[in-house]
Amino acid sequence: GKLSRGLGDVYKRQILNDPVLLRLAENHFWLSLADSDVLLWAQGVAVNSGLDVKISEPDVSPLQLQGPTSQEIMVKLFGEDIRDLKYYWLREYQLDGIPLIVSRTGWSSELGYEIYLRDGSKGNELYEKIMAAGKEHGIQPGHTSSIRRIEGGMLSYHADADIHTNPFELGFDRLINLDMKANFIGKEALKKIHQEGIKRKQVGL
């Protein structure tokens, strides 16, 4: 399966979220969300657009393993074939009976992986296995506001952007294609911003 980065549900000029879209099968998708909820919004879009889809929140818990030695730790856990997992691609794995989705993504601007646990009852077991595998590499728990993410210019929803921010203010112009034939939510609002210009822009110091 493959992943793509989204600006996340731009509505009336505002960013509601900045998720990663995972494609698990031809018609099976996950939105890996930032620090906000879009479940009811997505359900409302589906109903009002007449889409024949089922939208639900799965029993999935994400955990990230990031850093220059993350691949060596992943090899200890999953074997050598994990080295072949390309950036923004995913695979299904079983780790001693624990069902997982592993993607070559992360929130650190470093080599890293996201591990999606598909059975919440196995959370402690998974965590301990990862910490044991990473002990010789000095593995430590971290969080989304680590300095590596900030230095890499990776934005965190709520910390760096919110519902009052538009993509052009964040320098996300490269992710917006206003010339595409397909319509999408927020397209007209984004066209207007593009024509009028912005009054502020976020920069890193």
Go through each PLM region and give its residues:
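Conserved, structured C-terminal
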Residues: L22-L205
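Single conserved hydrophobic/aromatic residue that forms the stacking wall/gate
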Residues: G1-Y11
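Short loop/turn motifs at secondary-structure junctions and domain boundaries
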Residues: K12-R13, D96
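Gly/Ser-rich phosphate-binding catalytic loop and adjacent alpha/beta segment
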Residues: R13-P19
